[in-house]
Regions:
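Polar-ligand-bearing catalytic/cofactor-coordination segments
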Residues: 1-7, 68-159, 177-249, 307-319
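Hydrophobic or amphipathic, alpha-helical segments that drive membrane association/targeting
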Residues: 1-107, 246-319
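Basic, amphipathic juxtamembrane/active-site segments
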Residues: 158-167
Length: 319
């Protein structure tokens, strides 16, 4: 299994496990909603329950909003590009010979050089006329090898699934960091496929070099679920040096994510039937006191995860 696939499997497993724990917490606390609405918060346990429920609802809402934004952005992108679609020139037909891409390449009239793989169940490759005009035949074929890798792996669909979990599980910020590694590693593996198919690094490196001056001008939207040929420093370094990428997870995110899940499990235990055992403890450690620590961890993880989710938006607006 390749590193990107392992990262995706870990991300998916962590996301499903986290979802199960947080869903159990939500179901445990849900019966208190009617009581809170009827009589208000009477003690610290009620306050914690209300705040945790609010965090859960925010996570569900954020995940659904992210999913629908991605779907809507993809639909709008496709609609806009279809209106600019032109016939494939002989240069593209020659470059795609033997790649099993018949009927799956779209060429759009656009002054920005870009290429990307899009759509879910049956992915397609989109090229711009500016890209085709700038690249030599061997460079264009290397780009098609790169995008074909994404197409065969159905990477746009994987991106949608991963981004949904990263947004919905914002109280587990390490999921978002795994998503970032998975996305970059996928690009690196697509590069490696293009290099192998081209018999060397020269063709793909030439294409990336020609795209580099336009890297800041090409934007396909904040949450568009496509796999685009983006030029990044990490990819160029890997292409030149051949050094594998390291999984750079923030220690703070790892600690907060683990703490948040442990805290959620403790809250489930305290509120889900184990509270009788906790009530025998001294007052400092009794049930209301036990709720404060885990809830504080959840809130800290939520703040860190929320900052992770806002980072792409702030970079897009102010970067």
């Amino acid at each position: 299994m390749k590193r990107a696939d392992r990262a995706f499997a870990i991300l998916l497993g962590l996301a499903l496990g986290s979802s199960a724990i947080l869903l159990a917490l939500l179901l445990t606390l849900a019966p208190r909603v009617e009581q809170l609405l009827a009589r208000g918060a009477e003690d610290i346990a009620d306050v914690v329950a209300a705040l945790v429920l609010l965090l859960a609802l925010c996570g569900i809402s954020l995940g659904l909003v992210t999913l629908f934004r991605q779907l809507a952005a993809t639909a709008l992108l496709i609609r806009r590009l279809v209106a600019q679609k032109v016939a494939l020139p002989p240069s593209v037909l020659r470059a795609s010979e033997g790649l099993d891409l018949d009927g799956r390449i779209d060429l759009v009239a656009d002054g920005r050089p870009f290429s990307f793989c899009y759509w879910f169940l049956r992915p397609r490759i989109c090229l711009s006329t500016a890209l085709v005009d700038r690249l030599e035949p061997d460079e264009l074929r290397a780009v098609l090898h790169h995008e074909r890798y994404h197409l065969r792996q159905r990477d746009p669909l994987r991106q949608v699934v991963a981004r949904y979990f990263a947004a919905g599980l914002y109280v587990v910020p390490v999921v978002d960091e795994l998503l970032s590694f998975h996305t970059l590693q996928k690009e690196v593996e697509a590069d490696q496929e293009a290099v192998r198919a081209s018999g060397g690094v020269r063709s793909l490196a030439g294409a990336l070099y020609k795209l580099l001056p336009y890297a800041d001008d090409v934007s396909l939207g904040l949450l568009v679920p496509v796999s685009s040929l983006s030029v990044t420093e990490a990819r160029i370094d890997q292409l030149v040096a051949g050094q594998p990428l390291s999984v750079a997870l923030s220690p703070v995110s790892v600690v907060l994510s683990g703490g948040a899940l442990i805290a959620a499990a403790v809250l489930v235990a305290v509120k889900g039937g184990a509270s009788v055992a906790f009530e025998t403890l001294p007052p400092l450690y009794a049930v209301p006191g036990l709720l404060v620590g885990p809830a504080s961890l959840l809130f800290a993880a939520a703040i860190d995860g929320g900052l992770h989710q806002l980072r792409p938006l702030t970079h897009r607006l102010f970067g």
